[in-house]
Amino acid sequence: MPQDVDFHIPLPGRQSPDFARADAEQLAWPRSLGLINSEAAAERHLRGGYADLASRFYPHATGADLDLGVDLMSWFFLFDDLFDGPRGENPQETKQLTDAVAAALDGPLPDTAPPIAHGFADIWRRTSEGMTPAWCARSARHWRSYFDGYVDEAESRFWDTPYDSAAQYLAVRRQTIGVQPTVDLAERAGRFEVPHRVFDSAVLSAMLQIAVDVNLLLNDIASLEKEEARGEQNNMVMILRREHGWSKDRSVAHIQSEVRVRLEQYLVLESCLPQVGDIYRLDDAEREALERYRDDAVRTVIRGSYDWHRSSGRYDAEFALAAGAQGYLEELGRITH
């Protein structure tokens, strides 16, 4: 417990046939940008299994497209670790860093930008290549929401006001789990775009919210021991215990039930996609893109997350404590002068 907690995920597990190559080469990109500099940091990074995660999120991708997915996963977790210590308890410092990173969405960064920002700039440049302006605007909007969520979490820690209810927590955690940018990249990796007029439809929006919720619930179970070791109070298990007075086991069982119910709803929504195509009068190519979005983006981010969480070395207490009080081995967020 907790990585061995079982969830019934009624979706097939998949993995890119190019995983072994991508796994062997995964350190090249973060090292080239100064995001990993020491052997200790490299060893810690490899324990996370981020190439494995990307190969499950993007099983249709190979070569440079899969490499982009691996690099995004590497970046996500290097970025997230920067907020595990004092910075993540200081809203002003958090906003300073998230603003420095988000600036890459608007244009070239100054040389003084921190390494983690230059890493994101490279990811964004490669992600937006070949995608329509409408898609880039949608993805940028998702990224800004992701960054804003970190400031909200820092406010909670700064004022020592852990979330009192599951609903309050979900409203913020849905942003910082990073699922929407992850799903967006599936389109780029597969060289397709879901029809833009369908993206905000009720059915697709509900499917995506379930994907987000399942991911964050799986993550909170897997990361429970790590977060307990670090003194984190904002985890769904802890919140349910505070809100309802439940035991840890009952809180975990409730989350298992929530995931099961959400995935039952998800399958019903999936069955409505042909009718969505009819309502929006999609042509054959657009229907194919919608089916690919279901198969290669939403399904894979749900099932891939589960398979990876059960094996990743990221979520044990030793991984958390090895980095010390600041939560990371190398400072990647400092602005140079």
From Swiss-Prot:
Which superkingdom is the protein from? Answer: Bacteria
Question: Which pathway does the protein contribute to?
Answer: Sesquiterpene biosynthesis; pentalenene biosynthesis; pentalenene from farnesyl diphosphate: step 1/1; Antibiotic biosynthesis; pentalenolactone biosynthesis
State the top-level EC class: lyase
Q: Name the cofactor(s) required for activity, per the record.
A: Mg(2+)
Q: Is Zinc-finger set as a keyword in this record? A: no
- Specify which residues bind Mg(2+) 3 according to the UniProt entry for this protein: 219, 223, 227
One family name in Pfam for this protein: Terpene_syn_C_2
User: Which key words tag this protein in UniProt?
Assistant: Antibiotic biosynthesis, Lyase, Magnesium, Metal-binding
- Which annotated residues bind Mg(2+) 1? 80, 84
The name of this protein is: Pentalenene synthase
